[in-house]
């Protein structure tokens, strides 16, 4: 574990509640795709955020932070970032990193800013094996919550093996993607998940339901199901 002081080089408000933050650490760092860091608020208060950048991007760390009056836990971190333009982080954390088996097809599942977790995995997996079959299911309450959908669609142009499945719970008129939940979409698309590696970013309750459904109804291998939540449930 490494403790780093990081300068905040940019803060972009992607939506009214999501911020893209870039940090430049004061020393060398390393991590695996899918790991997270802890923002050190004080000695006893450390707050986890997935790294959206990849291990190959050595000069900076990118975070996607969902912060609003409904999420004061993250809002306090954003307040410090905006005020001090510098934060201290512990890096790396988490065991739900991208495994080295480059042949098994991937299913990446995220809700909201959980996309930061699967983004690092997606970009790293395609860099290692550009022909690997990858499907990403990204869910949000509204279309605006899928804030980097255009980046994904551009990536799929150069990777025909990459399938993007955006899922919205409350679609507006003209929405062309899926409606409902990401877990329902996965179950609709696959009769079996036995041959897939599955990475999930979401709340504990969502991860538990996914594990139960995928393993019991679609024969997913529990040892090929990855997500930070599984360390706690």
From Swiss-Prot:
EC number: 1.5.1.41
Keyword presence, Cell division: no
Known catalytic reactions: reduced riboflavin + NADP(+) = riboflavin + NADPH + 2 H(+); reduced riboflavin + NAD(+) = riboflavin + NADH + 2 H(+)
Enzyme class, broadest EC rank: oxidoreductase
Domain FAD-binding FR-type positions: 2-119
InterPro entries, per database record: Cbr1-like_FAD-bd_dom, FAD-bd_FR_type, FNR_nucleotide-bd, OxRdtase_FAD/NAD-bd, Riboflavin_synthase-like_b-brl
Keyword Iron: yes
TM segment ranges: none
PANTHER family attached to this UniProt entry: NA(+)-TRANSLOCATING NADH-QUINONE REDUCTASE SUBUNIT (PTHR43644), NAD(P)H-FLAVIN REDUCTASE (PTHR43644:SF1)
Family listed: Belongs to the Fre/LuxG FAD/NAD(P) flavoprotein oxidoreductase family.
Alphabetized NCBIfam families for the sequence: PRK08051.1
Subunit structure: Monomer.
Protein name (record): NAD(P)H-flavin reductase
Organism expressing this protein natively: Salmonella typhimurium (strain LT2 / SGSC1412 / ATCC 700720)
Gene designation: fre
């Amino acid at each position: 574990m490494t403790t780093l002081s990081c300068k905040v080089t940019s803060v972009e408000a992607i939506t009214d509640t999501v911020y893209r933050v870039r940090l430049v650490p004061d020393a060398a760092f390393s991590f695996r795709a899918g790991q997270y860091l802890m923002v050190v608020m004080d000695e006893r208060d450390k707050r986890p955020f997935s790294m959206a950048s990849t291990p190959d991007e050595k000069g900076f760390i990118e975070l996607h932070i969902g912060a609003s009056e409904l999420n004061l836990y993250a809002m306090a971190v954003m307040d410090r970032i905006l005020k001090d333009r510098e934060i201290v982080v512990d890096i790396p954390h988490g065991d739900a990193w991208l495994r080295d088996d480059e042949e098994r097809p991937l299913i990446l599942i995220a809700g909201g800013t959980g996309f930061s977790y699967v983004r690092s995995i997606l970009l790293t997996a395609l860099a290692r094996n550009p022909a690997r079959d990858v499907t990403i299911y990204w869910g949000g309450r509204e279309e605006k919550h899928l804030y980097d959908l255009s980046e994904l669609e551009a990536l799929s142009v150069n990777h025909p093996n990459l399938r993007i499945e955006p899922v919205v719970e409350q679609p507006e008129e003209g929405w062309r993607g899926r409606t409902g939940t990401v877990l329902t979409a996965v179950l609709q698309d696959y009769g079996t998940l036995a041959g897939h590696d599955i990475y999930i970013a979401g709340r504990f309750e969502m991860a538990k339901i996914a594990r139960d459904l995928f393993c019991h109804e679609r024969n997913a291998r529990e040892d090929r199901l990855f997500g930070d939540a599984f360390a706690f449930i």
